[in-house]
Design a protein with these regions (language model features):
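Shared catalytic-loop signature of beta/alpha-barrel
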Residues: 164
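Active-site entrance/lid segments in N-terminal catalytic domains of soluble metabolic enzymes
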Residues: 1-146, 150-151, 158-161, 170
């Protein structure tokens, strides 16, 4: 696209990978960056557990029936380019041979002990418009501005990852200044 681009960043346990993503965004003309802090671990998606959803799919009687009833989808799955995490495939084999779910990748590779100094480091390394996504309180909103964020995004990751948290709408009246 020729329009302005925003990159949504997650901090990885491998800080070199995080740095590499930021540098590549600069190189390829991204205009702003957003650090996501509201989903550092994969959510417990109960519906996916009930339905047996997984990536890659497990072959069960139900899934084989679904494959048979959806031949176009099945052929696309079998013959299309295999899934890979394009942003990290060049730096780690964890982004290539995805025989694990994306959820497992998140849980193994994303930094779960992120803190304010990590966020501030990313703001400074980026050096441009920077949003913090996942702000849940007035204190966090103020701290985000203090470390140099130019925007905040009030989020509970669409409720898909954090379905037990407060909704952004419920937080809005407290945070709006």
């Amino acid at each position: 696209t020729n329009g302005p681009k925003l990159f949504q960043l997650y901090i990885h346990k491998d800080k070199g990978l995080t740095d590499n993503l930021i540098e590549r965004c600069k190189k390829y003309g991204f205009k702003s960056m957003c650090l996501t802090v509201d989903a550092v671990v994969a959510g417990n998606r109960e519906r996916d557990h009930r339905t047996g959803f997984s990536t890659p799919p497990r072959l069960t009687l139900d899934s084989l029936l679904s494959f048979a009833l959806h031949p176009t989808w099945s052929l696309n799955y079998l013959f299309r380019k295999k899934f890979e995490l394009s942003n990290v495939i060049h730096t780690t084999d964890k982004g290539s041979k995805i025989d694990q779910s994306v959820m497992n990748y998140m849980n193994e590779q994303f930094e779960t002990k992120m803190n304010w100094s990590d966020a501030e480091y990313c703001v400074k390394k980026w050096g441009g418009p920077f949003a913090l996504k996942g702000v849940m309180s007035v204190e966090d909103a103020k701290k985000a501005i203090d470390i140099g964020c130019t925007a905040i995004i009030i989020s509970n990751h669409g409720g898909r990852q954090l379905d037990g948290s407060r909704t952004p709408f419920d937080q809005l009246t407290e945070i709006v200044d």
